[in-house]
C-alpha cells in the first residue's frame, strides 16, 4: 500500500509542476484537477497503509 501511495505522490507532484506552470488555461485546470485527485488518493492510501488495512497478497 505504501508503494502505491509513493507512486501517486510522485504523479501528483509531476501533474502539479506541469499544471501550475502552464500557460494554457484548459491544460492548467485539468492538471490542477489531477493534482488534487492524486493527492487525495495518496493520502487515502497512506492512511490505509499506516493502519495496516490493505489487500493481502
Swiss-Prot record:
Its main location: membrane. It comes from the Bacteria. It is found in: Cell membrane. It is a multi-pass membrane protein. The chain crosses the membrane at residues 1-21, 33-53. Keywords: Cell membrane, Membrane, Transmembrane, Transmembrane helix. GO terms for cellular component: plasma membrane. Pfam families: DUF1328 (PF07043). Belongs to the UPF0391 family. This is UPF0391 membrane protein NE0130. It comes from Nitrosomonas europaea (strain ATCC 19718 / CIP 103999 / KCTC 2705 / NBRC 14298).
Amino acid at each position: 500500500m505504501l508503494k502505491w501511495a509513493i507512486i501517486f505522490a510522485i504523479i501528483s507532484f509531476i501533474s502539479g509542476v506541469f499544471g501550475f506552470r502552464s500557460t494554457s488555461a484548459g491544460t492548467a485546470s485539468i492538471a490542477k484537477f489531477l493534482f488534487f485527485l492524486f493527492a487525495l488518493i495518496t493520502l487515502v492510501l497512506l492512511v490505509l497503509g499506516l493502519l495496516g488495512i490493505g489487500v493481502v497478497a
